[in-house]
Each structure stands twice: as C-alpha cells, then as structure tokens.
C-alpha cells in the first residue's frame, strides 16, 4: 500500500511498512499470512490467512473455481503469489522437503525414463549414494507391495500403476509435507481403495503432514483429520471441521455416525457457499 502527496512535481509515494509476521498456534506446520493472488485483475485470494497443523491430513474442499488446486500450488511454490508470506515450521519453502502428487499422472512422469528411475529421481537430485538410493527404493517397493515391472516406461503401465509410481516418487525423499492434487480422479474404485490404504499406512508410520485436494466430499472426509471448506471467490475459509475417527479407516468407516455427521455438515456448508 502507498500514500500519495500531490505536489507540484507529481505524486510522492511512501511505502507502508509490512506488518510483522504473526506465527500460528503451537503445533502449526504451515503458516500463511496475507496471501493474495489475482487472475485477470480479479482477486482469487485476498489477504488470506491459514494455519495448517503438523502431523495431520488436511483435505481442501470447496466450490468449482474457488482455487483449491491453486492454493496448494501456491503453498508448494508452483504458482507465484502476488503478496503474502508462507512459512513451514518457521522455515522458508527452500529449506523444507516436500513431495507432490499431480492430478494428471500421465504428464507427471518423465516418459524417457524407466519407471524405477522416475521414482528414484528426487533421491539422485539430493545426491544420495547408489547404496542409499537402492535401500530407499527397496523400502518403497516393499511398502507398496509393487507387483508390476518398474523397469518398464511409464506409458507402458496402467493408469493406476502410473499413479502408484507417482506417489512412490513423491514419498521417496521422505518429505515433511506431501501435497496431493486430486490423486484419485482418474483411478478405478479398486485402485482408489488401494491408494487410500497406502497413504494411511505412510501417514501412520511417518506422521507426514498432508494436504489433499479433492472434488469428492466422501473421499475428502474419509482421509482427513481436518476438512478445510472454502468459499466462492474471493476465497475465504468457510469452516474447518475436525474429524477424528481412528486409523486405519476402512469401508466400514463410511457408515460410522461420526463420518456421516462430518460429511453431512460439510455438505451443508458447501451448499450454503455455492448458493451465496
């Protein structure tokens, strides 16, 4: 913001000092302050604040066009912000290890690399030795119970196999934060159940903070510790709903009273915001 003094030589601008960064409450992993993003001159996010807790899965859900994917892309540094600040446990993004699972797995993998080399790619970028890479790859293969041939190229695999490999690659460097942008949107039901199970296993073993964008409310609630419900643009937080059913969650979870209540309340808030 600037103030203008109309003097004979034209306007004089004085920069207003940026307000001090206000940290989140204890247990916060990602702190967002004053986040602002414009598209075609219109605000998508304007002076947006959010605290994302550590060691939790937070699902992001909201109306079409509210900027769900844009939000996690800005947090992950894939989309520039116009103003604001984002810190990870008090650190900048460059000092934070992250993983990202893209919605379009067909474009996420390097087609000229074998699948096994795609998965190992972030480990090699870190400069890990061959022995370290081999050890971590063996852990991932065992964890995901991989049955398909990792020496094949991505385009030779099924959609579910490609997305499994994408998730393995995102988890390979053992990230502090894992971003998941509609990771189930192109998967069949059987593969969706498998990936849900594996993500929960990873979370229970590591406590990795996860941000999940989903267009499926049932899926968003099912995996979440918190459901972040967004408004229409300019986007605000409509409500953050806690959901605390024990893990691992299974198909039986879908009929539990607490799940049904949380899903119903989420739907009520969503419908209110869509009609706003």
Predicted regions mapped to residue ranges:
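The feature captures the beta-strand-to-loop junction immediately N-terminal to the Walker
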Residues: 61-63
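A short, proline-enriched helix->beta-strand linker immediately N-terminal to the Walker B motif
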Residues: 172-176
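Conserved ABC transporter NBD signature motif
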Residues: 83-96
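Conserved ABC ATPase "signature" region
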Residues: 131-149, 201
């Amino acid at each position: 913001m600037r103030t203008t003094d109309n003097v004979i030589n034209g306007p004089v601008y004085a920069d207003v000092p940026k307000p001090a960064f206000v940290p989140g409450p204890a247990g916060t992993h990602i702190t967002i302050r004053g986040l602002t993003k414009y598209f075609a001159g219109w605000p998508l996010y304007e002076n947006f604040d959010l605290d994302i807790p550590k060691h939790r899965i937070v699902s992001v859900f909201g109306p079409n066009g509210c900027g769900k994917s844009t939000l996690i892309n800005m947090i992950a540094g894939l989309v520039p912000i116009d103003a604001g600040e984002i810190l990870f446990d008090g650190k900048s993004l460059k000092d934070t290890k992250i993983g990202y699972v893209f919605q379009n797995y067909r474009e996420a993998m390097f087609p000229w690399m074998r699948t096994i080399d795609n998965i190992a790619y972030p480990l090699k970028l870190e400069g890990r030795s061959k022995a370290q890479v081999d050890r971590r790859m063996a852990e991932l293969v065992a964890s995901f119970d991989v049955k398909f041939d990792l020496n094949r190229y991505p385009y030779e695999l099924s959609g579910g196999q490609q997305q499994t490999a994408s998730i393995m690659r995102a988890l390979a460097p053992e990230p502090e934060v894992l971003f998941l942008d509609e990771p189930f949107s192109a998967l069949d039901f059987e593969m969706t159940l498998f990936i849900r199970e594996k993500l929960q296993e990873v979370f229970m073993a590591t406590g990795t903070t996860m941000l999940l964008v989903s267009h499926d409310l049932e899926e968003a609630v099912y995996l979440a510790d918190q459901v972040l419900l967004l408004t229409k643009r300019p986007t605000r937080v409509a409500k953050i709903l806690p959901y605390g059913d024990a893990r691992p969650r299974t198909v039986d979870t879908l009929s539990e009273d607490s799940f049904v209540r949380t899903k119903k309340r989420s739907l009520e808030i969503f419908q209110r915001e869509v009609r706003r």
